[in-house]
């Protein structure tokens, strides 16, 4: 449910140190167009879109930062066009492969967006994506947000919670259910649920390619993420012997939002070295 706003503090820090930052919004999210047909959304199509984006801008010597769907979509670019990338930063994500264990958190997320699930049935009529992000980043409790909304009450988002809620709601303001087709469909494209829509076969190939990379690879992992747990992050890092692994202690799934300056400083240190 996010967009490039998620990287706002990371971008601010990197630009202040002279780096050029490019933060695209996937189609269906952020400031990009919103395709209303849910069947349009699949990972192979988004991967192709991103490949065209990189090629049109002729991006080279890229340090790529990926998280969540950035793994399947973003790391595919590195696997297919390695000559364009000089460094990789991997945060709380995955690539489908034989033996990968989908956490209870992932399975619950799929269930909540399945037909009749908690979020599928109530977003955006009773509960907005901005409210979900305020809750997911611990700016408001579930009791004061989603539970109130489901009971017909209007959650009150104050201070930082209000700022976050407004920012993540902004791209979907006034669009209704059809305008939310991207957020509805993405969870259903996880290969645990749908191997074809999730582009599982290509993810498997890309996993092997990424693990054989010779460029610097840095893992930065939020330790409190129930979706992509720390043990998985460390296991993946161990498959790339020259990679580094940093725990972002206390960070949840959307670590860029809550721990941006810390992530930026780690990346700056690695790039300087």
Residue ranges, per PLM feature:
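Conserved HGGG/HGGXW glycine-rich cap/lid loop of the alpha/beta-hydrolase fold
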Residues: 1-31
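Glycosyltransferase donor-binding loop in the core domain
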Residues: 2, 225, 252-255
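Flexible "cap/lid" subdomain of the alpha/beta-hydrolase fold that forms the substrate-access gate
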Residues: 6, 29-65, 69-240, 247
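Hydrophobic residues on the short alpha-helix immediately C-terminal to a glycine-rich phosphate/catalytic loop
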Residues: 10, 77, 266-270
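A short linear boundary/processing microfeature
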Residues: 13, 174, 239-242, 273
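Conserved SAM-binding loop
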Residues: 23-24, 66, 90, 256
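Catalytic active-site module of serine/aspartate enzymes centered on a nucleophile-bearing elbow/loop
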Residues: 242-273
């Amino acid at each position: 449910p996010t967009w490039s706003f998620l990287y706002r503090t990371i971008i601010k820090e990197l630009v202040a140190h002279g780096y050029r930052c490019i933060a695209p919004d996937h189609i269906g999210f952020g400031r990009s167009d919103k395709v209303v047909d849910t069947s349009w959304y699949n990972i192979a199509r988004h991967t192709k879109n991103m490949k065209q984006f990189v090629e049109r801008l002729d991006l080279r010597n890229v340090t790529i930062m990926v998280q969540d769907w950035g793994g399947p979509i973003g790391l595919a670019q590195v696997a297919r066009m390695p000559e364009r990338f000089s460094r990789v930063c991997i945060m709380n994500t995955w690539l489908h492969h034989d033996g990968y264990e989908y956490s209870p958190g992932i399975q619950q997320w799929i269930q909540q967006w399945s037909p009749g699930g908690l979020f599928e049935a109530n977003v955006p009529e009773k509960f907005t994506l901005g409210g979900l992000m305020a809750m997911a980043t611990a700016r408001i409790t579930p009791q004061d947000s989603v539970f109130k909304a489901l009971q017909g009450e209007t959650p009150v988002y104050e201070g930082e919670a209000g700022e976050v809620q407004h920012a993540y709601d902004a791209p979907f303001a006034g669009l209704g259910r059809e305008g939310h087709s991207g957020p509805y469909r993405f969870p259903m494209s996880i290969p645990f649920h749908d191997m074809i829509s999730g582009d599982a076969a290509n993810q498997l190939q890309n996993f092997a390619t990424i693990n054989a990379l010779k460029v610097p690879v840095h893992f930065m992992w939020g330790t409190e993420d129930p979706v992509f747990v720390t043990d998985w992050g460390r296991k993946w890092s161990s498959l790339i012997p020259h990679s580094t692994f940093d725990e972002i202690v206390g960070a949840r799934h959307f670590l860029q939002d809550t721990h941006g300056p810390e992530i930026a400083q780690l990346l700056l240190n690695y790039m300087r070295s």
